Structures are given as C-alpha cells and as structure tokens.
C-alpha cells in the first residue's frame, strides 16, 4: 500500500491522502459548499487545475471567486478558449493561433478561411459562446509529445499551431486542454473545471482588429477578436460604465474639440500641434525647466542622427535595431528610381533614446570626482519605428520628446541621488493632483552584467525609496521580478487617474553597463580612473503621452495654469464691446491668457461653445457691468455665476493662472 501524502492547508491543518488524489478531492472532503466554489488550486504556490494529482507532500490553498486576481485571470483565460471554440463552430475552416488574458479581458487571433472578421460578427460569436458555457463542458488536461501535437495540428489543417509546436523543445512537457470530447487547444493552463463555471452574462466581445502572426508584418494578417471578461454581471456593468466614461475623456476626441492637435497618415505616429495644444506643451516645458534648474541639472541638446557604430557600441543596435529608423550616410541617397544604397555606405540612425549622446558629452574633457554628480537634462526628441497598428493618439507615437536626464555619479552618491529624484517626482506629481504607486522592476532573464552588479543596483534603489519614506502601502510599493531593463533595474511611477486607470510614466534606473561600453570615466580621489554610475531618469516620460494623460484625467478641464485660454470676456449686448476690450487688456496685462467674444449671438450660445472648448472662466458683461465696472463670472462646469468688480476677478484668475511652483 502506498504511503499517504501530507497536504497542509492554509490554517495549518494537515490532510492525509493517497497519491493521485487531487485538490478537488480535498475540497469535496471539506464540504459541498467549498467543492462547488473551488475554481483552481495553489500547490506549493503554483496555480494548477483542481484535477491535478498530488505526487508528493504539498502546501495547498484552494482558489475561489474571493481570490479575485487569480479567479479573474482564470476566467479570462477560459473566455479566450471558449471564444476560439465558438469561432471554429460558426466559421468552419478558421485556423486558431493564440489568445491570452489581458488586464481587463482577453483576445484571440484567428486566420479566417474566407474573409476577415468584422464587428458585425461579434453578436453571433457571443451567442455561440453562451451555448458552450451553458453546456458546462468539462475542461480536461492531457500531456502530449511534440510529435503527437504536430501530427494533430497538421491533421486538422492548423498550420499556425503546427509551426509553433515544431519549434518547441523536444523534451518540454506539452499540454493540451479538451473542452468536452470534441475540441482542444494547446495551452499551459491552468483552467477552470468546466465551461459552466463562467458567468454567461459577465463577458462582452468589444472589437475586431488586424494583427500579424507573431507580431511580424512580413507574416500573415490575422483577425484579432477582443473581449472583456469578469466574474459576474455587476463587475462587467461597472467596467462598461468605466469604458463609457473613458470614451468621453478620450484625448483624441477632446484634442479635436479643443483644437489642440491632430494626426494624419502623411506623418504616421507624429503629432501636428496646433497653437492651443503647443501652448500646453510650452507651459509644461517651462514648469519642468524650473524644476530641474532648482534641482541642480544642466540642460543640453544632442544630435538627432548618429552613426550606427555608436549604437553598436552602446548595445542598442543589437537589442533595438528593428525599432530604429536607419538611413544610409550617402549623398545623394535617392534619385528618380528610388533610394540609392552603395556597398560603401555607412549607416546612420535617428536616435530612439538620448542616453548614449549624454555619455558622449560626459566624456568631453577629464572629469574629477569633485565634479560629480553631474546631472545632464534634455528635452530630447526621439524616434522609434513602432508598427502602425500599435500607434494610439498621443499615447503611442513614433516621434516623441522626453523630459530626459542622466545623472553621472560616484558609487557613494547613488542612494542620495535616487532619493532626491524620488522627492522631486513626488512634488511634481502632487502639483498635478495625481496619486501614484512606486514599483521596483527587478532583473529580467536576458540581461547584461554580473549577478553581484544586479544585487547591488537593486538594493540601492530599494534603499533610496525607503529613505524617501515612499516604500509604504500608501504609495503602493511593490517589487516586480523580471520587469527591469536589460541593463539595469528601475523604479517606476504609476499614476492613478480620475477614473481609476493607472499610467506608468516616471522611471529611474541605475546603470553600470553603458558607462563601461562607452568608456566613460572620471579621476577619483586616488588619482586613478573610475567608472561613473549612470542614473537614467524621467518624470513625464514623454510630453506627448503626459499631455494625453492630463487631457483624459481632467476630461479636458485642465488646471487654469495649463488651459490654453484661461478666460473669455463675452458680451451680452454690443454696448458693452468697448468695456470688454478694456477688460481684455487688463487681463492680458496681468499675465492671463484671455480673449473676447463680441459676436452678435445669444449668451447661452456663447456659454455652450466656450464650455466645449473647456475655457475655465467666462466673464459675462452687459450694459450694467460696463457701467459698474464689474463682471459676471461663470466657472466651467457650474450653472450659477457670481458678480464681482473686475479688479477682484483679475486677482482671482491671476492666482489660479499661476503655475503651482510659482505660487507664494
């Protein structure tokens, strides 16, 4: 008789079971309620199916809907599989590829037999998914050999799956999941016990888009079907409400209504800033300059185009070449027939980042340890060759400007420099009214440098956050294994906006690799050469994306100091035109960005129009206001108005129109 296995539960109690028993067996032994509620299990910390047999003593925690993070991920994963099964039932001959869960749902990529899918197909697919859920089909895991898997996929005409399976290691354990006895997919799992564990009213298919197989535009174009999935209808409804609110706040929509910027096909991924939008940019740029000047940074400007050999030396060519705009260093490089590239031409690249150029500035002249830290700042314009399908308004562009800085310092200065940056970022984000969380992204699997170097770099960032008093639950402190850059760990700032979304913006990274690769050095107190440590840091991330976040966070109602037009003097009657012009002159003299609206239109029409433009203050004047030297102030979003002397109104506006760092 086999020796019983000891399974330890979260409360410390131990259950003895026979080898081959499963978490589902233990759930049933505890009680029918738990057996029904259990969705999956954590065995020694690993999330597994309820039917996975025990082979040794283990720690067991049963996962139910109360474990929301795990339960949601399981549900979304299963919704993706049900989606694939439904599509193949409705559209025979469609090939399946892959479909992961996402932050708020799932998607699956398909190769349709006859035509690409469209949004019009979604209702029918949803209905078929609900049939599969209602059938309560058991989800069963099996381990297959690579040959068995390839044979199956070829037999079914699944060329994409067969291609993928053929590249898997021969000795890797490969798993498939059956849905009932008539449909299967290749998947690592885990999954829910059956399709009936999904709520048929807690998902919605949202859209269809194109996607290239393996993300390579040289490959076949697939149809990607997106969906959102939740544990119950209440969660789904709340999410859809958030989506509706997000649509109202969409920076592309508001940017058009407010006449801030536009994008067009002739310059994919590059922004055409209109006067009002560029004014916001200039205000942010001036604000950031004051902040970095006060923190001891020195502003620089570096070239847009550099020799490919520089990028090879820095390591970016090998890691990042596919995302760089590369051009031949040859004149002429184009004629009537098209591009000219000779075998003798060198290659140049538009910079995708500023860091190598800042190292080249540091290397000019001999540096002493007394000159460190040296903080170099640049509003650096960069270019990255992002796929067309990945571009999204201001949030994902090809040309962008970073509030980029690099701090060259000694080993003994790292913690204090990172701490100072943490405190600077804290002040800046609070000026914009954001709450945020801080994450420490730890070493990735593929990386430069030694283990000792990474140990030290991670410890320094952690210590700096602790010293700044930010490594607390209040600031959402969290460590993220595997999320660091290939050359350094990093701290990340995740802003929370008005509707609860998070945006990763600021970063700081300690880097010992690039100074080594580009031969940066300083003379130490001992008279010998030493390598500086390079701290890469940004607060806005990019001006484009930060402006997009601000527009959506404030729903276009920007703080008065950032509003392109801060006040409009609108007349009720033409008799007040001269008074309106005098009021405008006084507003401008006080440094307030103002305009007049003297059109022969009803005041309600003017109010509505300037509200759409998100003008913070409307100063309404008629014959009475002109005689008394007053204005009727109407604040954006409020129904009532308040009458006050013009001078008082100007004083009020001047206070709010002043940037927060300049207020007394």
From Swiss-Prot:
E.C. no: 6.1.1.3
Disulfide bonds: none
Keyword Ribosomal protein: no
Localisation per UniProt entry: Cytoplasm
InterPro entries referenced in this protein's UniProt entry, alphabetically: aa-tRNA-synt_IIb, aa-tRNA-synth_II, aa-tRNA-synth_II/BPL/LPL, Anticodon-bd, Anticodon-bd_dom_sf, Beta-grasp_dom_sf, TGS, TGS-like
Catalytic activity field: tRNA(Thr) + L-threonine + ATP = L-threonyl-tRNA(Thr) + AMP + diphosphate + H(+)
Residues that, per the record, bind Zn(2+): 355, 406, 536
GO CC list: cytosol
A GO molecular-function annotation: ATP binding
Chain segments carrying region Catalytic: 250-559
UniProt KW Ribonucleoprotein keyword: no
Keywords: Aminoacyl-tRNA synthetase, ATP-binding, Cytoplasm, Ligase, Metal-binding, Nucleotide-binding, Protein biosynthesis, RNA-binding, tRNA-binding, Zinc
Entry's cofactor comment: Binds 1 zinc ion per subunit.
Positions of the TGS domain: 1-64
Pfam families (UniProt xref): HGTP_anticodon, TGS, tRNA-synt_2b, tRNA_SAD
One biological process term in Gene Ontology: threonyl-tRNA aminoacylation
Cofactor: Zn(2+)
Subunit structure: Homodimer.
Its job: Catalyzes the attachment of threonine to tRNA(Thr) in a two-step reaction: L-threonine is first activated by ATP to form Thr-AMP and then transferred to the acceptor end of tRNA(Thr). Also edits incorrectly charged L-seryl-tRNA(Thr).
Classification via PANTHER family: THREONINE--TRNA LIGASE, CHLOROPLASTIC_MITOCHONDRIAL 2, THREONINE-TRNA LIGASE
HAMAP family, sorted: Thr_tRNA_synth
Similarity comment: family membership: Belongs to the class-II aminoacyl-tRNA synthetase family.
Name of the protein this chain belongs to: Threonine--tRNA ligase
Source organism (scientific name): Novosphingobium aromaticivorans (strain ATCC 700278 / DSM 12444 / CCUG 56034 / CIP 105152 / NBRC 16084 / F199)
Name of the encoding gene: thrS
